[in-house]
Amino acid sequence: MSKIAIIGDGFSALFTALELAKKGEEILVISNQKDEFESGILTPFNTPALARDGAISSSFLGLVSKKSELDIALCLNENFRAWMANFTLKSTKAHDKKMRVLFKKFGQKSFEILRELNEKHPQINFDESGVYLIFSEDESFKKRLDETRVADSEQEILSVDSELANFGLINKNIKGALNLAKNASTDVKELRNALVSELNELGAQFINDEIYELKTQGQAVQKAVGRAGEYEADSFVVASRNLELSSKLGTNLSAILAKFYTIDLVLSEDQIPKKPIILNDMFAKIYPTKNGVTIITNLQVGAIDTLVKTEKINAFLNELKRHLGISELKEPRFRANFVLLSSNDKPAIGRDETYQNLLYNQAYGLNELSFAPHFAGVLADLIKDGKSNEDSDEILLFSSFYEG
């Protein structure tokens, strides 16, 4: 039995801890236990890459029109400039085509894990009935239909009139709708509780501390240094939204922080959508909760801060109101959130090039639950079997370390 320290408490951290605990390893999960937002919408099927043809031009136009999946505010930060250069290179049709195949491949494997977990813990409500994709512009809906293969089992063209009641509060100015039939959703709070419960049963230890440094000797990490103590282990896995630990060691993960807002609304039962909604032309997502919805805005990179900018939220809500069947938003709660975003749509997963007992499981963006459950097992095998990154075809395929 070896001792393994997992730094972070998001789903990439918890699934990695669980896979290692199942293999009989001694697990230490260290995090500052911040209440960070995690998306329960899983869309690995029929979803384009963030870096794709036209992404750059639409992102800069988005600064004016507020209609872009990624708002880019230029800044002089060297890490951002490097990220931006690589993101620009990857924004091609060929990259998008390849990533769609990889999203599907690894999404299926994560779904298998979540399916099994749902059998044991049905309260996580892993629902594979699909996700609505709603269009507010005729042009974008027509373009999507033109790109759709005949008899595509992964997406269903819906009759807006017959489905309207299922859309909940989104019931105006809808030009078209699809059901992305193979995508899914889950209750993230219940999923987290289930994972923590399993880890407790397996003897994992949870420590509330903020790790700010990894101390090394030679080509190995000796200990993780936190505000409240130091923690020794045989292996360390960084699975948080922290870039400082890797940058202090001279490792560039080709990732930056991206900002987005969540807006929580309290609604009556008939106003809650029957399943998650993606608003195609606003690049927003709507996630049903027990007493309302959580709305997830598009991502912002570059010159960002931690503040809640009410003018941005108000502009977003003013546009959203075109689609709402309610005149007043009751008890709205706003929050600024952050995710690590790679420049090539791939997470940073695998061993550090220099420090062989240090591994990363980071930078999934908003897609953590679509892929982290599977890659937790891939990393666990690397640690348990003493393998290198090159021994894993899946890491070579899907890690940002192996794509410029």
Describe the predicted segments one by one.
Residues 85-197:
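Rossmann-like flavin
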Residues 32, 40-89, 213, 229-353:
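Active-site substrate-recognition segment that forms the wall
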Residues 150, 155, 326-404:
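C-terminal catalytic lobe of FAD-dependent flavoproteins
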Residues 47-48, 183, 300-303, 359-372:
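Glycine-rich phosphate/pyrophosphate-binding beta-alpha loops
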Residues 1-10:
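Beta1/beta-strand and adjacent pyrophosphate-binding region of the FAD-binding site
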Residues 22-40:
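Glycine-rich FAD pyrophosphate-binding loop
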Residues 173-227, 231:
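Helical element adjacent to the flavin cofactor pocket in flavoenzyme catalytic cores
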Residues 13-14:
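N-terminal Rossmann-fold NAD(P) dinucleotide-binding loop
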